[in-house]
């Protein structure tokens, strides 16, 4: 027995350490002069594989990114880059705000099945138990606020780029919580995983829709450990139960950038109720006429509620096929019934009862992944919608199929990505009628700013990458002679903004 156990352990260790590790970009620093910015970094790879190194430049426009072609990039870039100390120099583009992505990968692949299998049903159950409770703006405001806080805290802790999209619904300000895991080379091509976090005012909302929120949270935790070509966006929608108000506002009131290409939405709408009992699944009126093959298959299986419903329209075939393929590949035990509704679903109102419909209206591909709501779960919108009525095995499999689709569609990278924001501004020396001197340059322990006729002013000092170092307002009396201590500032080039009512003076100051 001892030898057998030792052999099993040895095989496990060989398999564990045989997995090729992705390269890492470490110890990054940057130096900027009037013409270029140079990134110095260490490229490491546990197996000393040669790597491909890319550098991508994007112009930031609102919440979107516009790819920019920059000629003349030099240094350790391209194929067959060995490990060690590296440097890449980039000619500065015109004035504006930019995102610089350095990408390094070694040509190997991740074991996607192993990533899918990281979905933990005990974790899902724990999240569900915490989320369970009335989450409504009137009947359960305290619980709703607690759930909002936990979603925001999670998105922030995972080092995504979080934001909150707000809109008015009567006197209530709804909040859609967003986390962007931006893609390395195509950040404007976006996959979305969403779930609404509110529930009806008279129930604990375990299946509807704590299951969706817990599933989204689990995927966001796992996805955070990897890099992708495309972006993955997580959204917690507010006020779904009153008519998809949160998602309608997001789609129609500034949540989506016109520069974004939404390649697919996985909308979780009740993903935890499962029954293998005959006649546990009912169907909407007319279902057999619109979906005869699916209706016949459900009838042949004695109307068991043992499948996840994948609702799509014709515009959503790509993301639907990806979900079905993922289920077949990574979770073959998950039974999927796919329904393609005509147009945007006007003939099938029962299949428009979730946030995917807001995306359909906007022409974006989206799926509703659902256990069927009241057509299976008789606890729907009642006080009995509790966690202990749900099936963790089934829910876990839905989450696994979803994460598998995201891994494939967002193009996971077996490598590392370093992102840096860069601000390029041309210096402005003077304004008419105002005399300003900023000295010494290079600066020492004290930076002096003297002026005449400036009046009230604001001094703003930041690094060329946009990090704010100093900000202070001065009245007309104090603005004539300003002294700023700089002894603790690191060596770098800084942008000094001297803002007055007449305009802004920009100067670049160096500290050696």
Feature-to-residue mapping (PLM):
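Bacterial Sec-dependent N-terminal signal peptides
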Residues: 1-22, 426-428
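Extracellular acidic, Ser/Thr/Pro-rich low-complexity tracts
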Residues: 42-49, 59, 453
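A glycine-anchored, Pro-Gly-centered beta-turn/N-cap motif
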Residues: 82-84, 88, 96, 455, ...
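N-terminal capping segment at the start of a domain
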Residues: 108-143, 198, 376-385
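A non-catalytic alpha/beta surface segment that caps or lines the substrate-entry region
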Residues: 126-182, 336
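Acidic/histidine-rich catalytic neighborhood of metal-dependent amide-processing enzymes
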Residues: 200-315
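Active-site-adjacent substrate-binding region
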Residues: 271, 277-422
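C-terminal outer-membrane/trafficking sorting elements
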Residues: 429-512
